[in-house]
């Protein structure tokens, strides 16, 4: 506390004991028995403490990491079927995060009294990617490639894994990526989105999961080299190589345009788990050609009709099939774990409608409960919804649009009808486009919306 005028106690001007600003230069000045602190210094101290907390390494124990059986059990609650893919993902994710427990703990940087790094400390060593070592054996990272038809659950599997492990998760669309310098998103933007997902906490981001969807859409257009540059196909694959394998990516800090003089954030992608997914439409034909029996002369066999389905063929996928499809060998080598998803049949689609925690029927039942009504979807209607989704070849994604279409008129009129007790969807509501049946509270009277005029 300073006193600018000692003649009169009422003329005393109070100063912050930390920054020296007067009470007229700050919004608030908090007093203690002997010192004062302003609101600006309080905010600064809060930020410093929060940064120190974020820098503390997270202590992982064996109990905190779920076993493959536990991971599989959690996936079963949200994803129906796909047993082979679940088992493959559970083992790969468990091994990946088990590997992270053996990473060397970061050394604390020596700072002087002003909070600046002490000269002479080895800065180059801190920028090298951290490697997991067990008994002098380096544990390499195993990224994952998901192959399956559209609507089979690839994205949902990745989202459920990230939610269970409580790690930063980001989805990227490969179709929007281009080489650096061209119109579109650079591959480094993926890491920037991951940082945004964890509030720019670099330590958390370096343990996150990145899901790159539609990876099959950046395949090479042809096997023959072209004169023109393929900036959205093979060029993107080349740009993804170092990012997927592990490199120090330079990402602009939060509010980069507002603070152009700030240094770029260095993010080590060595320990980020990359999951790439795609439908790979037409890959089954490549596999079919490779596995077809051939011969010469009298030993030649007439190729008959292959009765194997898409799911059976995709299980037999080999790296050479992916290369022929259009992925470059270097990228395939960096995605060693390949999990194939089966095409969903009618019974699986019915289970998806009713069994998971966030099943579609349960969601619409909750919506109608808000209006004071119940929703009943009969077994025949569930079967009709599944058959229509199979005919549209949209997989589980098509279920919502079909159910939404059948309930559109009901959800439009229901807020105005206060005496509806139950809404019933039967087979005719789906197959023939009929109106759902309404059961009123006053008397049991089945009436459809067409009678309301």
From Swiss-Prot:
Give the residues the record marks as binding ATP: 149-156
One molecular function GO term is:
zinc ion binding
Disordered, as annotated region = 108-127
Q: Which GO terms describe its biological process?
A: cell division; proteolysis involved in protein catabolic process
Instruction: Give the keywords, sorted.
Output: ATP-binding, Chaperone, Metal-binding, Nucleotide-binding, Zinc
Q: Show the ranges annotated as biased composition (Basic and acidic residues).
A: 109-127
Give me the Gene Ontology terms describing cellular component: HslUV protease complex
Name the CDD domains for this protein: RecA-like_ClpX (cd19497)
Name assigned to this protein: ATP-dependent Clp protease ATP-binding subunit ClpX
SUPFAM superfamilies from the UniProt entry: Glucocorticoid receptor-like (DNA-binding domain), P-loop containing nucleoside triphosphate hydrolases
* Oligomer and partners: Component of the ClpX-ClpP complex. Forms a hexameric ring that, in the presence of ATP, binds to fourteen ClpP subunits assembled into a disk-like structure with a central cavity, resembling the structure of eukaryotic proteasomes.
Q: Which domain of life is it from?
A: Bacteria
Domain named ClpX-type ZB is located at 4-57
Annotated SMART domains:
AAA, ClpB_D2-small, zf-C4_ClpX
The gene for this chain is clpX
**Per its UniProt record, what Gene3D superfamilies does this chain match?**
1.10.8.60, ClpX chaperone, C4-type zinc finger domain, P-loop containing nucleotide triphosphate hydrolases
Which residues are noted in the entry as Zn(2+)-binding?
Answer: 16, 19, 38, 41
Which purpose does this protein serve, as stated in its record?
A: ATP-dependent specificity component of the Clp protease. It directs the protease to specific substrates. Can perform chaperone functions in the absence of ClpP.
Q: Which family does it belong to?
A: Belongs to the ClpX chaperone family.
Q: InterPro entries recorded for this chain?
A: AAA+_ATPase, ATP-dep_Clp_protease_ClpX, ATPase_AAA_core, Clp_ATPase_C, Clp_protease_ATP-bd_su_ClpX, ClpX_bact, P-loop_NTPase, Znf_CppX_C4
């Amino acid at each position: 506390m300073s006193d600018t005028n000692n003649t009169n106690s009422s003329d005393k001007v109070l100063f912050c004991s930390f920054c020296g600003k007067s009470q007229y230069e700050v919004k608030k000045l908090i007093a203690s028995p002997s010192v004062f602190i302003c609101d600006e210094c309080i905010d600064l101290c809060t930020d410093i403490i929060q940064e120190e907390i974020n820098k503390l390494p997270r202590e992982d124990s064996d109990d905190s990491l779920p076993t493959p059986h536990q991971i599989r059990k959690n996936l079963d609650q949200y994803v129906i079927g796909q047993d082979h893919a679940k088992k493959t993902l559970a083992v790969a994710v468990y091994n990946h995060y088990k590997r992270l427990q053996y990473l060397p703990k970061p050394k604390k940087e020596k700072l002087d009294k002003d909070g600046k790094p002490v000269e002479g400390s080895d800065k180059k060593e801190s920028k090298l990617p951290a490697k997991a070592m067990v008994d002098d054996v380096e544990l390499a990272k195993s990224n994952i490639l998901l192959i399956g038809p559209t609507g089979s659950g690839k994205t949902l599997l990745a989202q459920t894994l990230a939610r269970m492990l409580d790690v930063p998760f980001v989805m990227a669309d490969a179709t929007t990526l281009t080489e650096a310098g061209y119109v579109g998103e650079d591959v480094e933007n993926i890491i920037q989105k991951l940082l945004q997902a964890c509030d720019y906490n670099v330590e958390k981001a370096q343990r996150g999961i990145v899901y790159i969807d539609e990876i099959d859409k950046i395949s090479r257009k042809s096997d023959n080299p072209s004169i023109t540059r393929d900036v959205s196909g093979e060029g993107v694959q080349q740009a993804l190589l170092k990012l997927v394998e592990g490199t120090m990516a330079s990402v602009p800090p939060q509010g980069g345009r507002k603070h152009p003089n700030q240094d770029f954030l260095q993010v080590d992608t060595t320990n980020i788990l990359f999951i790439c997914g795609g439908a790979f439409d037409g890959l089954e034909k490549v596999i079919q050609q490779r596995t077809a029996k051939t011969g010469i002369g009298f030993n030649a066999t007439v190729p008959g009709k292959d009765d194997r389905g898409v799911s059976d063929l995709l299980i037999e996928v080999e790296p050479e099939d992916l290369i022929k499809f259009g992925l470059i060998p270097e990228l395939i080598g960096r995605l060693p774990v390949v999990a194939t998803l089966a095409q969903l049949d009618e019974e699986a689609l019915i289970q998806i409608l009713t069994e998971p925690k966030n099943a579609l029927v349960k969601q619409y039942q909750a919506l109608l409960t808000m209006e004071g009504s119940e929703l009943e979807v009969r077994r025949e209607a569930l079967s009709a919804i599944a058959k229509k989704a199979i005919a549209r070849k949209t997989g589980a994604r098509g279920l919502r649009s079909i159910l939404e279409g059948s309930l559109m008129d009901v959800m439009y009129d229901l807020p105005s009808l206060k005496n509806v007790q139950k809404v019933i969807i039967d087979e005719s509501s789906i197959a023939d486009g009929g109106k759902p049946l309404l059961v009123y509270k006053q008397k049991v009277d089945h009436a459809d919306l067409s009678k309301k005029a």
